[in-house]
Swiss-Prot record:
It catalyses: a 2'-deoxyribonucleoside 5'-diphosphate + [thioredoxin]-disulfide + H2O = a ribonucleoside 5'-diphosphate + [thioredoxin]-dithiol. Belongs to the ribonucleoside diphosphate reductase small chain family. Fe cation 2 binds at residues 98, 158, 192, 195. Keywords: Deoxyribonucleotide synthesis, Iron, Metal-binding, Oxidoreductase. This is Ribonucleoside-diphosphate reductase 2 subunit beta. The active site is at 105. It comes from Escherichia coli (strain K12). Gene3D superfamilies: Ribonucleotide Reductase, subunit A. It is an enzyme of class 1 (oxidoreductase). One of its GO terms (biological process) is ribonucleoside diphosphate metabolic process. InterPro entries: Ferritin-like_SF (IPR009078), RNR-like (IPR012348), RNR_NrdF-like (IPR026494), RNR_small (IPR033909), RNR_small_AS (IPR030475), RNR_small_fam (IPR000358). Provides the precursors necessary for DNA synthesis. Catalyzes the biosynthesis of deoxyribonucleotides from the corresponding ribonucleotides. R2F contains the tyrosyl radical required for catalysis. Tetramer of two alpha and two beta subunits.
Length: 319
């Protein structure tokens, strides 16, 4: 029987320095939800209205659905088309962290919410047409045979579709509510920013190898897909935030992040500045230096609890 040759990855021979740069960023950013003291948010959770609590749970089940899609189908679907073995390794890290993100929302639920309410939110996520529709649109391209269209879909998921949900914890954080939960969401946002940047970078590297006509065709596809997703996201936002006055602010946030997604692909913004004008309080809450005392880049800080070993002497225990 003839055996297929398997090549061992060699991190000492790298053809694209970006692979090592992003690998190092992702591994240095590694975190787990168990280290964030979510229980400190219980008093704030109890001050939210029933509508706000239900909205929060629905937002987080929607985000969990997208993380599950990216973990199980999205990142793995990109691996066969990787340009380097190191790119495959980075994509495997991305896939794993999407599973961590999905796990994180369950940590929030188990800490703050009643099981029956969480079950109702999960049932809602399976029945909500716009939420299921956006997952189906993205999944359709992941299961297709065009590697560049897969990357476009992945960047739009990472850099755009999450943000109708991310808006809510940033809003609460800007008002001093659920601040530890917001810290956890910032860790997720930090990861997604790197994921979207890296996959967009790889898209642009692949674009260098194709004809001008193919590039124009893919650009047209990207803008058409974004508009399809945007129209669906408007409907999702209207349904999700129906009992609040916040839908218009969320839609501005969508335009802002849609433009960022296009920039990750190397394209010009689609939405004019007046449509993408985000409330400064939301942008401040997104900042690495937001008031939750979180070191955004190292993953350390007062809200991310890591045990430290300190050597002691016998006399230290004489109280």
């Amino acid at each position: 029987m003839k055996l297929s040759r398997i090549s061992a990855i060699n991190w000492n021979k790298i053809s694209d320095d970006k692979d090592l740069e992003v690998w190092n960023r992702l591994t240095s950013n590694f975190w787990l939800p168990e280290k964030v003291p979510l229980s400190n948010d219980i008093p704030a959770w109890q001050t939210l209205t029933v509508v706000e609590q239900q909205l929060t749970m629905r937002v987080f089940t929607g985000l969990t659905l997208l993380d599950t899609l990216q973990n199980v189908i999205g990142a793995p679907s990109l691996m066969p088309d990787a340009l380097t073995p190191h790119e495959e390794a980075v994509l495997s890290n991305i896939s794993f962290m999407e599973a961590v993100h999905a796990r994180s929302y369950s940590s929030i639920f188990s800490t703050l919410c009643q099981t029956k309410d969480v079950d109702a939110a999960y049932a809602w996520s399976e029945e909500n047409a716009p939420l299921q529709r956006k997952a189906q649109i993205i999944q359709q391209h992941y299961r297709g045979d065009d590697p560049l269209k897969k990357k476009i879909a992945s960047v739009f998921l990472e850099s755009f579709l999450f943000y109708s949900g991310f808006w809510l914890p940033m809003y609460f954080s800007s008002r001093g509510k659920l601040t530890n939960t917001a810290d956890l969401i910032r860790l997720i946002i930090r990861d997604e920013a790197v994921h979207g940047y890296y996959i967009g970078y790889k898209y642009q590297k692949n674009m260098e190898k194709i004809s001008l006509g193919q590039r124009e065709e893919l650009k047209s596809f990207a803008f058409d897909l974004l508009l399809e997703l945007y129209d669906n996201e408007l409907q999702y936002t209207d349904e999700l935030y129906a009992e609040t006055p916040w839908a218009d602010d969320v839609k501005a946030f969508l335009c802002y992040n849609a433009n960022k997604a296009l920039m990750n692909l190397g394209y010009e913004p689609l939405f004019p500045a007046e449509m993408a004008e985000v409330n400064p309080a939301i942008l401040a809450a997104l900042s690495p230096n937001a008031d939750e005392n979180h070191d955004f880049f190292s993953g350390s800080g007062s809200s991310y609890v890591m045990g430290k070993a300190v050597e002691t002497e016998d006399e230290d225990w004489n109280f």
